[in-house]
Amino acid sequence: MQTTPSIDPTLEWFLSHCHIHKYPSKSTLIHAGEKAETLYYLIKGSVAVLVKDEDGKEMILTYLSQGDFFGEAGLFEEGQLRSAWIKAKSPCEIAEISYKKFRQLIQVNPDILMHLSAQLARRLQNTSRQVSNLAFLDVTGRIAQTLLNLAKMPEAMTHPDGMQIKITRQEIGQMVGCSRETVGRILKMLEDQHLISAHGKTIVVYGTR
């Protein structure tokens, strides 16, 4: 069951200086190619970070959930353009603040920059693991690893047999770089091995908590 963690005093202070907005599921929050001027903080919900090729085919790079910053690239180098699309995976409540105002807050309380920096370091580690998985794991391994990662996210729900997640076969394919049909075949194989159960968008990953 998803819970809302108690908020850190520094983050609470930071949020008091932000504009808070709510977005419905499937809303596009950031468009690739637009000028980067705003930092975002996810209070509730989850978003997908994705890129598109010239034909409009999407690849999901990662999911972000409550407590995550995003849109930070232009904070450190002016004139940056957004490099990825951000879309709401579920209804979201998001704090938004201009880079200019955030830089002013850093002067008052540098701890907020440490929060952001710690997240960026963890995200870099996750990206390194993702690149390694793409290079060294076959598609079955990539899908299995993706399911394990999703089972650890805040929106995963406890289930008597493990953790329950909601994701489509198309979304899994966009994350690991394969077709929806391939995902379906591998999920069936994982079911036959009694590692998961999959019914529509609902997947239970056994033995995870």
Swiss-Prot record:
Residues annotated as site: Activating region 2 (AR2): E96, K101
Residues that hold 3',5'-cyclic AMP 1 according to the record: G56, K57, E58, M59, I60, L61, T62, G71, E72, A73, R82, S83, T127, S128
Region Activating region 2 (AR2): start-end pairs: 19-21
Binding site for 3',5'-cyclic AMP 2: A135, F136, Q170, E171, I172, G173, Q174, M175, V176, G177, C178, S179, R180
InterPro entries assigned to the protein according to its UniProt record, in alphabetical order: cNMP-bd_CS, cNMP-bd_dom, cNMP-bd_dom_sf, Env_Response_Regulators, HTH_CRP, RmlC-like_jellyroll, Tscrpt_reg_HTH_Crp-type_CS, WH-like_DNA-bd_sf
Entry keyword Acetylation: yes
Modified residues (N6-acetyllysine): K100
Subunit structure: Homodimer, which upon binding cAMP is able to bind DNA. Binds the N- and C-terminus of RNA polymerase subunit RpoA and sigma-70 (RpoD).
Protein's job: A global transcription regulator. Complexes with cyclic AMP (cAMP) which allosterically activates DNA binding to regulate transcription. It can act as an activator, repressor, coactivator or corepressor. Induces a severe bend in DNA. Acts as a negative regulator of its own synthesis as well as for adenylate cyclase (cyaA), which generates cAMP. Plays a major role in carbon catabolite repression (CCR).
Domain text: The N-terminal domain binds cAMP and is responsible for homodimerization, while the C-terminal domain binds DNA when cAMP is bound.
UniProt name for this protein: cAMP-activated global transcriptional regulator CRP
Gene name in the database record: crp
